[in-house]
Amino acid sequence: MSGTTMVILSAFVAYLLLMIVIGVVYMKKTSSSEDYFLGGRGLNAWVAALSAQASDMSGWLLMGLPGAIYSLGTGQIWIAVGLFIGTVLNWVCISHRLRKYTIAANNSLTIPAFLENRFQDKKRILLLLSSIVIVIFFLVYTASALAAGGKLFNTVFGIDYHVALAIGAAVILCYTFMGGFMAVCVTDFVQGTLMLIGLLVVPLVAYLTLSGSLSDLLTQSGAPGGAAAFLNPFENGERPYTFIEIFSQLAWGLGYCGMPHILTRFMAVKSEKELKKSSVIAIVWDILSLTAACFIGIIGRAYLLPTVLGENGASSSESVFIEMINKLFSSHLGLPFIGGIFLCGILAAIMSTADSQLLVTASAASEDLYHQFIKKDADSKEILTVARLTVIVVSVLAFVIAWNPNSSIMGLVSNAWAGLGAAFGPTVVMSLFWRRTNLAGAVAGIVSGGLTVIVWDYIPLAAGQTLGSYTGLYSLAVGFAVSLVMIIIFSLATKAPSKEITDVFDKVAGK
């Protein structure tokens, strides 16, 4: 291992040790399941905002999105536009009412518990169904984060992908196991800050060191359709984007209102005043980070010449940010330790999502399944033990799913995002804003949304292709629409909610 690599490694080791120390500190402060899952509802504005956005964006922000733009051009920015719109609507429209409603609904600690309490589901159908959906789709989502970590260590240090996968999984498991929600949120705050600094600094410095015009360098790199097409958001190589392609990318924004690991941040903020501050901080962070990630894909295509990623044995396009940092700080500026810190920003993005996903899955398994169905008289410490064991089991299963080094980060994230967004998004929105929504409608929404995504993405029904591949339409858009329609139909076709349920709704709505 070269001297430069050793310096970068020292930055990684220092960073990983800091995360573990945070886990140890908060392990001592975590004595109950409410502490472990929601931090005692004590998050301040900055921690809530940055932890929500960091856990949202994941390695996809620093690897998947820049890689897609690097390969296909700025037409991929419509995903970023959709995500920004979704973020704004989630913070402005969903966060305040969800926080109030989860407190009014028997102080619900998780999204499945909230849905059960919201509709007074005595048969526990919603709790069981929601928990199963979370475990299934979060396994895939967590696997995407672990795969990103494996690719990071493999690219930077030349470590075998599978060994790298194990290292990343072990560290994330360690501090999530120990500290629970507060450890995850504090580490996510650190990680969200580091991500944003890296996103802003690296493309700017790389642009200033370009040895020619951006347009000329893009043409030399073999950009699809030439520089003009590459920089045109309405072009896909040598042809215009279709309406369906743009709509499908914008539809990513629909997923936000169905993401349990993001929604729990709203539930955990300590006051309405702090939540308002969080909204502003989160939206500003989102604008800056998404814009910078898009520029990484564009500038990276020119900056890395003569290397063209994805060709002639070079790294995949999803490694564009990693390769930029290595070239900029190790080769051009001779500052490998600083480069190592920025590479930790990528690791931060990966870890911030994986830890949140592990925690949500643990809460679904321990609080919503074990406590409610297996041992109802379990005390808080026993639930905490089950949660920690769940973190271990889920980590191992996600590790197995991520074992293939050719796994696409973008593909894994896309499928998991669609499944969770379609299953929970419409149900959460309607439960918060439509008084007539009832138990039958909520069940129909979750089942139809989740199944639509599975059928659309995995079952070849059209000339040997899946409907997603055949139509080019993102499964989240279809699943969200189907779920919304089913909620309305089943709610209107069955008995209206009781007065007790509507009284709580009216209280939360301020009527």
Regions found by a protein language model. Name each.
Residues 1-511:
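Membrane-embedded helix-loop-helix hairpins and adjacent transmembrane boundary segments
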